[in-house]
């Protein structure tokens, strides 16, 4: 039975009161931005959060767009354990897509819907300092093999001062997941990981990871198998069982880092479902997976 509109608003009130003046880091994944309408709906919801007194920070991905751009340029996208293998050319393509296209588009939409957006990368103000990940040693057909995933980084230090300044002035920061190392090299860092690290550095109340599935599914082919709550202690077992796999691994690990570092809750939700973020935040039932 559908709730009356006034009941929905009353149900939302205690959550709005609880979250007032709190910071929420929202990762908008490329897979959640499969159409212009979905993107607009997500940004409208984020601007609404700002208007009800919440301080949102956006970290965006762009995986499908990067892959599409690579294919148009005749280059095959390759992945290892959910991370994009990033050689010099792929790094340049990623910067072109993330900074020149997606970031500016999100900032523009925020302005269109009455908010104040400002774009950043991790190397602006040395916000995200990192290092290149070491080569991976894995068994392939019983033979130990070294896999170099290129300019894929891990963050070492998050400098959130500029974000605090922007939030206090009413801006919505929009961050591309590109870091810088000690030598000034750009690093491609998984956006879920960046979002978790930034949420921890900002002491955010919530980390919200938006993707194209309705949270963590016990059976990826069955939307009804959603796991609504995951404890930190259960994550390793779920990875061993294969329930958490592929691109969901960095999402869950990013969420776990954030929660272990003091973020109260992390949520994985389906951004392609209309207003799913508002339903997750402001209703009793929720629509995604909560990590705590």
Swiss-Prot record:
Single biological process term from Gene Ontology = L-arginine biosynthetic process
Which pathway does it take part in? Amino-acid biosynthesis; L-arginine biosynthesis; N(2)-acetyl-L-ornithine from L-glutamate: step 2/4
User: Which residues does this entry assign to the site Transition state stabilizer?
Assistant: 27, 251
Where is substrate annotated to bind? Answer: 62-63, 84, 188
| One Pfam family here | AA_kinase
UniProt keyword annotations, A-Z: Amino-acid biosynthesis, Arginine biosynthesis, ATP-binding, Cytoplasm, Kinase, Nucleotide-binding, Transferase
| InterPro entries from the UniProt entry | AceGlu_kinase-like_sf, AcgluKinase_fam, ArgB, Asp/Glu/Uridylate_kinase, Glu/AcGlu_kinase, NAGK-C
Matches recorded under Gene3D superfamilies: Acetylglutamate kinase-like
Q: Name one GO cellular component term.
A: cytoplasm
Main location per UniProt? cytoplasm
**Record carries keyword Translocase:** no
Alphabetically, the GO molecular function entries are: acetylglutamate kinase activity; ATP binding
Enzyme class at the top of the EC tree: transferase
Cystine pairs: none
The protein's Enzyme Commission number: 2.7.2.8
Q: What does this protein do?
A: Catalyzes the ATP-dependent phosphorylation of N-acetyl-L-glutamate.
- What family is this protein classified in? Belongs to the acetylglutamate kinase family. ArgB subfamily.
NCBIfam families for this protein: argB
The name on file for this protein is: Acetylglutamate kinase
Q: What is the lineage of its organism?
A: Archaea, Methanobacteriati, Methanobacteriota, Stenosarchaea group, Methanomicrobia
């Amino acid at each position: 039975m559908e709730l009356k509109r006034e009941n929905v608003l009353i149900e939302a009130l205690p959550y709005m009161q609880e979250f007032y003046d709190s910071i929420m880091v929202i990762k908008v994944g490329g897979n959640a931005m499969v159409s212009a309408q979905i993107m607009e709906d997500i940004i409208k919801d984020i601007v609404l959060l700002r208007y009800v007194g919440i301080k949102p920070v956006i970290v965006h991905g762009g995986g499908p767009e990067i892959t599409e751009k690579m294919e148009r340029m005749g280059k095959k996208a390759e992945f290892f354990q959910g991370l994009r293998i990033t050689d010099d050319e792929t790094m340049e393509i990623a910067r072109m897509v993330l900074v020149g296209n997606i970031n500016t588009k999100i900032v523009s939409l925020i302005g269109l819907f009455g908010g104040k957006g400002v774009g950043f990368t991790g190397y602006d103000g040395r916000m995200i300092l990192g290092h290149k990940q070491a080569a991976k040693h894995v068994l392939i057909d019983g033979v130990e093999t070294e896999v170099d995933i290129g300019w894929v980084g891990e963050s070492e230090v998050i400098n959130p001062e500029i974000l605090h300044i922007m939030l206090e002035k009413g801006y919505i920061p929009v961050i591309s997941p590109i870091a810088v190392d000690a030598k000034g090299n750009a690093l491609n860092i998984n956006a879920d990981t960046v979002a978790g690290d930034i949420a921890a550095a900002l002491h955010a109340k919530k980390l919200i990871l938006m993707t194209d599935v309705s949270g963590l599914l016990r059976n990826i082919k069955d939307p009804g198998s959603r796991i609504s709550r995951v404890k930190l202690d259960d994550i390793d077992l779920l990875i061993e069982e294969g329930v958490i796999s592929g691109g969901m691994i960095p999402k869950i690990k990013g969420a776990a880092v954030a929660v272990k570092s003091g973020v109260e809750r992390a949520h994985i939700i389906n951004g392609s479902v209309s207003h799913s973020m508002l339903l997750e935040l402001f209703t009793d039932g929720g629509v995604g997976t909560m990590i705590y």
